[in-house]
């Protein structure tokens, strides 16, 4: 029964392109959930408010989920994914929207980077066909030199040290 509920929820969600939303709304979202729109990973430094992406919006015009991505050559990299209500299919619908676009753009893979403490993300992506492709040891220490507000301790009291790259090969 729960599975049909999730499927029903996903079917009702229509992700909007972030370019169709007010820029200040996107910036405020990233400030609230990440401290700033700036994302620093081993793959680069990004202004998430300037990236392409999709958002799920509720009836009150509140962002329930937002994903940003970057396409370079035949690779699509998910830079950020946030879902405000877990277990309702928001993250799944956003990832699927990016995968569909990546296929249309002839990308061979979708990839992303998360940190070693983000066990929920590791579970989420692996359940959706992503595989671990690389561990970048001490990458977060380097990122803190650019963005010192990155916390030392993350989810479940786990020290944030390493980045983990996940990939999904597209057919």
How would you describe each model-predicted region?
Residues 102-114:
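Conserved GNAT acetyl-CoA-binding A-motif
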Residues 80-82, 111-113, 165:
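Short aromatic/hydrophobic contact patches that present stacked aromatics
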Residues 112-121, 137-144:
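Conserved beta-strand-loop-alpha-helix junction that forms the acyl-donor binding cleft
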Residues 1-21, 164, 168-171:
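Conserved N-terminal entry element of GNAT/NAT acetyltransferase domains
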Residues 17-86, 92-95, 169:
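Acetyl-CoA-dependent GNAT
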Residues 37, 41-44, 48, 60, ...:
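Conserved acyl-donor/pantetheine-binding loop and adjacent beta-alpha core of acyl/acetyltransferases
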Residues 88-102, 123-127:
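Conserved acetyl-CoA-binding loop-helix of GNAT-fold acetyltransferases
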